[in-house]
């Protein structure tokens, strides 16, 4: 079985590095881009992720409330989880209701568990 490609959309290189390390240690094949425009270019180059982890406040999404739809348009069928330091009450005022959301700072085990759960939601995946 090949490693699942997990796309990380994150503008903070330190967080991206940590997430990349955790996913690689868990046996996945992480790929990192800094914003939605780079994710679009990555897709246009013929890449397809098994799942996407994205920071909520990344450039090129049209706003945090539009990020889930923007990512879904680029990667149809790929499950998405958001990562953010924005508190829950602030997310509500931004119009963000997408789940799952991993709140920063997060435990590394929570990240690994989230990715496992995301991969289990892919079409054609048996549980």
Predicted regions and their residues:
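Conserved acidic carboxylate
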Residues: 10
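Two-component/phosphorelay signaling modules centered on CheY-like receiver
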Residues: 13-31
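Conserved phosphotransfer microenvironments
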Residues: 55-72
